[in-house]
Amino acid sequence: MITDQITNTIYFSHMLEQVCPDLYRSMITLKEKGFPIEFFQGAKDMWARDYMPIQVAPNKFVAFKYLPDYLQTPKYRDTITENAADIARDLLGDKAEVIDTDIIVDGGNVIKSDNDASMVDKVIQANPHYSASKLFAELTHLFGCEVFLIPWDDEEGVYGHSDGVVRYLSDGDLLFTKYPDSKYIKQCQYILKYHFNKMHNLWMPSSGAKCRERFQWAYINYIRTKDYIFIPALSKNADCIEDTTALRQFELRFPEYPKENIIPIYALEALKKEGGLHCCS
C-alpha cells in the first residue's frame, strides 16, 4: 500500500480557486516557492480526495465509483465528478495503470497504512449491490491488503469518512482526532487496537474560543508527503491557542520532519464547507 509518507506530489482541483479563493492563493504561493503542488482541470468540485483514484502501488491506482448519497439532491447532483478516472489517466499518461470498479467509495473514507486500510462501515450501506462478504473480499483484492472497518457515527455527520477520525503515523501507530464524542473514539480504538501498536489522541485546550470549537476536529485532516506536512489552521497567522497547541503536537508526533517542514495553512474557508486540507487534495 502506498502511504502518505512516501508520496511526493500534491494535486488540487482547479475548482479550489472558485470555491475557496483564499486557500487557492495560499497553495499557489507555495507552488511558486517550489513546493510540490499541482492543479488539474475537469472536475466539478474541489473535494479531490473523494473522487480521484486511490494509489495502491507505485504504478497502480483504483478508480472507485463516486456516487455519494449526500449529493443525491437537485442542488448538488451536478457537482458529482464522474470522469475522475479519465482525469487521472491524462495526468499520469503511461506512468501508471488506473483500474475501474463499480464499488462506491469516497476516497476520504480510506486511510492507508503500511499493510492495511481503515474505512468507516458506511461503505457497506453505500454498496447494496454487493453482499457484505463479497464487498469486503473485493476491497481486499483491490487494495492488496487487509481492510478494517470502524463504525459510522451518523449522528455526527452524513459523510462517514475515516479521514475525519484517524490517520496513520508510522510503525503501526495511529493518531485520532479531537472528537466531540469520546465514547465513539474509544469504540474505534477498541476495534483497531488488535491490528496496530499504539493509539494517540490529539487534544485541545479548554481555554480555546467557543467559535472555533466546532472546527477542532480538522487538525486530523492534514496533508502529508515524504517531505512536508500541511496542517489546517483556524487563524490567519496560525497563532490562536488551538493552532499553536496542534502544531506542538505534530512536531512531537512527527520527529522525522524538520519543524520548518510542518506548515500550518489557514483553512477556515474550507472548514466552513465541512472539509479540510486532506479532503481538498
Predicted regions and their residues:
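The feature marks the mature, well-folded catalytic cores of soluble enzymes
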Residues: 1-281
